[in-house]
C-alpha cells in the first residue's frame, strides 16, 4: 500500500505516547479491564475506581457495589458454561455464574476476549492495508469492517487505525532510518515487517510506535522503491535521507494541492458554463415567448381590423340599400299621390262640367223648378216664384263655369286635391204641389216660420267690401230676400191666361230676362254704401250648391286657396238652390249657434273669374246645339218626369224648345 493512501486518511484522533501495542495484545488483564466490552459500551473507564463512577457491581445487603475484574476462575467457569450451553443462552449462563455478572457482560467478554476465533497480537502489513481500504469504503462503521476482517473485533479495528494515523504524523529521525536499514539487511530472506516494527519499538528512539506497514513503506522510500540494498548509512547519509524524504513528502503535498486547485477550477468553470447555459436558455425562452405573443397580438389585431372593415363595408352597403329603398318608396308615394290627385282633380273637373251642363240644360228649357219636383214625394208644385228660381239657376250656372275654370287652373299649378268645406246640408221642404189640370189643393200653413238667407247690415256697410257672410236671419218670404239683396229686372209676361203662374211663354220670357242682365245675376250684388261689387255666387260641387263670396280687386290672394273657397261656397249655394226650389217659395234653414266666419275663406279675383267664364262660354259656343247636353234632357230625368203625375207638361215641346239655336246662343251670351 502506498504512502498517499495512508496520508489521505482523516487525522483527527490523537493517541498518547504511552500507548504500547505489545502491552495491549499480550496482557490479558488489560484486555479485561481497560478494553473490555463493559468499559466500551456500558460505562466509562477510570484509573481509580469509585462507586459513583463505576458501572454495575455486586449487590450486597441491597446495595450494588462496583463490579470486580474478571479473574482466571471466572474466565475458566465462563469457558465451561459456553461450551455446555452455547453462545446464545446468556441469561442462564449469568445465573450459573452466581449473579455476579450479567448476561451482556458474559457475552461481550466471551466474544472479545475468551473466544478462540479472535486473533490476538499485533497487526501485520496485510491486515493493516486491508483495514485502511475498508475505512475508506465504510468510514467509521467498525462492525462492518470487523466482519470483513477475519478474527478481529470492532474494537481491535478501531484502535489499530488510530495507531497507524499516529505513527504517520510523527516524522522519521535519522537514527530510526539507520536501525531500519540495518535490521532489514540482517534478516535477509527471513524478512518480517512485524518483527522489524517490534524491534524499532524496543529501541525507543522516538515516542511513537511504528507499525509493520509504515516500516515497509519507509524502507521502500529509502531504497528508491526498487528494493535494492543501500550502502551502509552514516550521519551524512541519514541527513540526506531525511532531506530527501522531506522533499518527496512536500512534493506530494504540492501535487495534491495542485490537483485540488485544478479540481476547484474545473468545478468553477463547470458552474460558470452551467450558469451561461441557464442564462442562454432563459433568454431564448423569453425571446421565443415574446415573439409568439407579438405574433399572436399582431394576428389578432389584423383580424379585428379586417372584421371592422367588413362590418363597415356591410353597414355602408346596408345604408345605401336603405336609402335607395326609401327614395324609391318616397318617389312611388309621390307618384301615387300625384296620380291620385290628378285623377281626383280630373274627376272633380268632369263632375263640375257635368253639373254645369245639367244646370244649363235645365235653365235653357226653364226646368229649374223641376229639380225639386223630381226629388219630392208630392204630386204637383206651386208655380209661385218661378221667375226667381230661373234667375238663381242662371246665376248658379255661371258660377259653376267660373269655378270649373278656376279648379282647372289650380290643378295644373298644384297637384294637391282641394280641401272642400262642406257644411251640414239644408234639405228644403217642398209643399203645396198641385196639378195644372186639377183644382189646386190649398196647402196647410207651415208650423214654423220660413227662413231665408240674408246678409247682415254690418257686412254691407263695410268700406273695404270684404263681403263676409254672417249667421242668416229669418225672413217672411223669398220675395223679401230678392228685393233686399238681389237686384234683377222684371219683365211682364208676354202672354196672359187664366193660369198665368206657369206657362211655356213665361218660362221663355223669364229666361230671356235673365240673359239680358249681362250675367249680373250670377253674382249677388250689394248696393249699399256705393259698393256695386258682387258679394257672392252659387257654386255646385258633387251635386250640392254653395254660396261663395267674392273679394274686391284690391284684396288679391294666392290661387292655392281658391279651391277651398269655391268648395265652401258650393255647399252654401246648394242649400240656397234647394231652398229656392221650395214649393212655397220659402227656405227651410237649419239654424245653429255657430258663426260663419270659419266658413269664409279668402276670395278670388274678379278678373280671373270673368276671364274663365268667357273662355267657358267660347268653348260652349263651338259645339253644335244638337250635340250639347242642353239640347236634350237625360233619359233618367225623362223617366222620372213620366213617372210623376204631371199631365200638364209635354216633354216633346220641351225638347223642341231646347233644340232651338236662338235660345242656346242667348244662354251662352
Curated annotation (Swiss-Prot):
Acidic residues bias: start-end ranges: 30-40
Annotated region described as Disordered, given as residue ranges: 27-69, 226-530, 550-636
DNA-binding region, residue range(s): 90-114, 142-166
GO CC annotations on file: nucleus
Pfam families cross-referenced by the UniProt entry: Myb_DNA-bind_6
Domain HTH myb-type residues, every copy: 60-118, 119-170
Domain Myb-like: 172-223
Superkingdom, natural source: Eukaryota
Primary location: nucleus
Keyword Transport: no
Protein name: Myb-like protein M
Organism this protein belongs to: Dictyostelium discoideum
